[in-house]
Regions:
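Rossmann-like NAD(P)(H) cofactor-binding subdomain of soluble oxidoreductases
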Residues: 82-136
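Rossmann-like NAD(P)-binding element
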Residues: 59-97
Length: 300
């Protein structure tokens, strides 16, 4: 079984806190050091026993030396600063992971900031979260049964990747691997686009002169569709900008589909409108059931 003496979590929020709790639950880490720019977050993490030691950003390079595992759980646009912060504390065998929702950009800054230590960085993206953020929402079970996507680097050794897989398995997760470019394209479609739509809908309705009436009658359908608009604006701003090209491609495809749908409604094309909705309902039901047999990728 894997075992780590010292875990350093940079960014003590929902994901970083849940990771620490999951490894504590699995009894594979002896000490957790939390590093954050927010004193309030660090105090909450100590009070909730998510971390054992709290360090400010300025104290981290010295206080966190000797770490054998480092997790970067900060917004993707803060990754460059995070890599620069941790480089001095990396031993020869320290493993570094991120939790970023975009990969090509994070890998780029890792190469720049880590230099000869880049082989110690194994990019990871846990597909888990909640619409609430902050360490108070951290949960040891957050990753149970969830996918974690690794996008290994050419510089990574097989042993480093295997150890990272073991780490996430200890958290209760399932592990899959793909290229960084494939990752960014996939999640632009199924994660980043839905978040943008939820933010846009709530913002548009809230700006209307009759917003009070609209929200007073909003019910379960609106709540379900817009749940993810409660997510961290800072995190999702960074994701949108860092995965801009892939996200714009998906937004254009969605706009085209919405225009098509508008045309069906405008022309009262009941047959095609019904067919579109039926296809959508059936595809969603198959996805929920885990029946992906009728879905095809171009390469298969």
């Amino acid at each position: 079984m894997i075992k780590f003496k010292r875990l350093v979590v940079i960014g003590v929020g929902l994901i970083g806190g849940s990771f620490a709790l999951a490894l504590k639950r699995a009894a594979v880490v002896d000490e957790v050091i939390g590093v954050d720019r927010s004193d309030a977050a660090l105090n909450d993490a100590l009070r909730l026993k998510v971390i054992d030691v709290a360090l400010s950003l300025s104290d981290a390079p010295q206080g966190a030396k000797g770490a054998d595992l480092v997790l970067l759980a900060v917004p993707v646009r803060q990754m460059a600063a995070a890599f620069a912060l941790i480089k001095p504390l990396l031993g020869d065998h320290t493993i570094v992971m991120d939790c970023g929702s975009t990969k090509q950009d994070v890998i780029g800054v890792a190469v720049e900031k880590l230099g000869t230590k880049i082989a110690q960085f194994v990019p990871a993206h846990p597909i888990a979260g909640r619409e609430t953020s902050g360490v108070a929402s951290a949960d040891a079970t957050l990753f149970d049964g969830k996918n974690v996507v690794l996008t290994p680097l050419a510089e990574n050794t097989a042993d480093a990747v295997s150890r990272v897989e073991d780490i996430w398995h200890a958290c209760g997760a399932k592990v899959v691997s793909m290229s960084a470019s494939a990752h960014d394209a996939v999640f632009a479609a199924v994660s980043h686009l839905p978040h943008m739509l939820a933010f846009a809908l709530v913002d548009e309705l809230a700006a209307r002169p009759n917003a009070k009436s609209l929200f007073s009658f909003a019910a379960s359908g609106f709540r379900d569709f817009t749940r993810i608009a409660g997510s961290s604006p800072e995190m999702w701003r960074d994701i949108a900008l860092n995965n801009r090209d892939a996200l714009l491609t998906e937004m254009d495809a969605y706009i085209a589909k919405t225009r098509h749908l508008r045309g069906l409604i405008a022309t009262a094309d009941a047959a095609e409108l019904s067919a579109l909705m039926t296809r959508s309902r059936d595809a969603r039901a198959q996805w929920l059931a885990g029946d992906l047999g009728s879905f095809r990728d171009k390469s298969t």
